[in-house]
Amino acid sequence: MAAEEHALTSTEYIKHHLTNLTYGKMPDGTWKLAENAKEAQEMGFSAIHLDSMGWSIGLGIIFCLVFWCAAKAAKADVPSKFQSAIEMIIEFVDSSVRDTFHGKSRLIAPLALTIFVWIFLMNLMDLIPVDWVPMLAQIVGAHVFGMDPHHVYFKIVPSTDPNITLGMSLSVFVLILFYSIREKGIGGFVGELALNPFNPSNPVAKALLIPVNLILELVTFLARPISLALRLFGNMYAGELIFILIALLPFWIQWALSVPWAIFHILVITLQAFIFMMLTIVYLSMASEKH
């Protein structure tokens, strides 16, 4: 349990572990690190979650370096275990793309690989004991920057931050729009929204049903990035919260509960990365289809 447990109640302990390291502009015009959730809220859209951004970028760099090293060390005759593992991941993603995406694009397979591995690495951070990195951040904040340890927040699981998951899903949404307009044209894209799901042969009925179709299709279309983001965020946030609740229990109970939950959570970590990747492929495949 965290070193500050004697000073914090259980509720404060949970809130502390679920609060991001936030930097932003205060209403008085000053830029600073938020010392509590209220200050972070006052920063509004100028607030930046430094921990989520830092870990996301860092894990992205690790992903690129690992695959770059694998490519540099690749051998055609006798592949190493490391090369074999990387090739298995690539072949798995490539087969998923070939089975699901029916359009023609060189972007989809690299995009799917990036999404799967990057989200998997972000989710994997949830297996690090909840107090280790925050305690280190408190020590650094107190001794290097002279900060109050109780005001040092540091989350290490980027996928438990809705800003990160929404950012990724909105990027996918932009690609969906791009492929839809590229393959169908603006007229075809608008027509697809206006003439589905109800498309009677009678011209009058067709015209009357256009507003209904637009409402239904726009809601469905706009719900895709939101559901994509919230599904990943919700599952990972719940998993992190359970680890935090386990950390509040006596030491001898923690191991009895945390180990089985961590083993089960490995499945959740992998499954959520896979679901995000597959839904991205499916949505882009639908956008690439010509009707």
Swiss-Prot record:
One of its GO terms (biological process) is proton motive force-driven plasma membrane ATP synthesis. It is found in: Cell inner membrane. It is a multi-pass membrane protein. CDD domains: ATP-synt_Fo_a_6 (cd00310). One of its GO terms (molecular function) is proton-transporting ATP synthase activity, rotational mechanism. Keywords: ATP synthesis, Cell inner membrane, Cell membrane, CF(0), Hydrogen ion transport, Ion transport, Membrane, Transmembrane, Transmembrane helix, Transport. One of its GO terms (cellular component) is proton-transporting ATP synthase complex. It comes from the Bacteria. The keyword Transmembrane helix applies. The chain crosses the membrane at residues 48-68, 108-128, 161-181, 241-261, 262-282. F-type ATPases have 2 components, CF(1) - the catalytic core - and CF(0) - the membrane proton channel. CF(1) has five subunits: alpha(3), beta(3), gamma(1), delta(1), epsilon(1). CF(0) has three main subunits: a(1), b(2) and c(9-12). The alpha and beta chains form an alternating ring which encloses part of the gamma chain. CF(1) is attached to CF(0) by a central stalk formed by the gamma and epsilon chains, while a peripheral stalk is formed by the delta and b chains. Key component of the proton channel; it plays a direct role in the translocation of protons across the membrane. This is ATP synthase subunit a. The gene is atpB.
